[in-house]
Amino acid sequence: MQAVKLLQKVKRISTKITIPSLGEIKDWMLVAYSDAATKKIDHAFSVAGHVIFLVNKRTHAASPITWSSKKIERVVSSSLAAETLGVVKLIGVLYFIKEILKQMYGREQGNIPCLTLIDSKDLHEAVHNVKNSNDKRLLGDILQIKQAIAVDGIIDELRLIPSHEMMADVLTKGGRNGEILLESVRNGKLFIAGGTMIERSKKIEASTWRKLIQAQSEGFDTLEEAGLDAMIDSNKDIK
């Protein structure tokens, strides 16, 4: 019944899609919105959604490359877990896109920076701070996100934005208004919360994350020792 209503709405409302000129490759950036919702399928499984744009950071011209709304196979009980697994899935997609761009334009010119936007404060803090999640099963997933930022360079910045500016919200929650996403597709423009300037967080130090990843690979029962050492080193650098 809901599908019928959606089809009727689609037929009733006329729209258009604008494919703009994206200008010079040196001005390009990838902008990815990632969102998740818990227990939306059969009151058990969560849903992760993302939409990725190729954007000219000078003119704001933008074209969507891909989008997804899929069930998270692992059963989770918290929004932090769902959001974390959603970003982990997104990392694989971003890696694939960046490799294609490198093959098309060369490894140097095709190495386009990537800004990833989330609205989960808990996930943002877990990635940017040296602290453990209460859900020990998430440790490896959060480390994977940290590695994608600090070591692999797949994500250049993980930015926290207000929930009302989350374009992937409509891909994970029924009944949400997708007008801001539709408007961007119609106009071929994307205005990003916080601007197009990508800033690496001062809290993210590659050496810190390498220590955490090394600690996990060496089989620490917990990451407290590695986290404490990394924090001490970071404080020394600041001083």
Residue ranges of model-derived segments:
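Generic beta-strand/beta-sheet core signal
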Residues: 20, 33-35, 55, 117-119, ...
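Short, flexible loop/turn elements at secondary-structure junctions
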Residues: 10, 14, 34-40, 54-56, ...
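Short glycine-rich loop/turn motifs
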Residues: 28-29, 46-52
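RNase H-like nuclease module associated with reverse transcription
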Residues: 73-239
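Two-metal-ion RNase H-like nuclease active-site motif
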Residues: 26-43, 119
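Amphipathic alpha-helical
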Residues: 1-22
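A short, polar/acidic, helix/strand-boundary loop motif
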Residues: 52-85
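A short glycine-rich, hydrophobically flanked beta-strand micro-motif that places a catalytic Asp/Glu
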Residues: 15-23, 30, 98-110
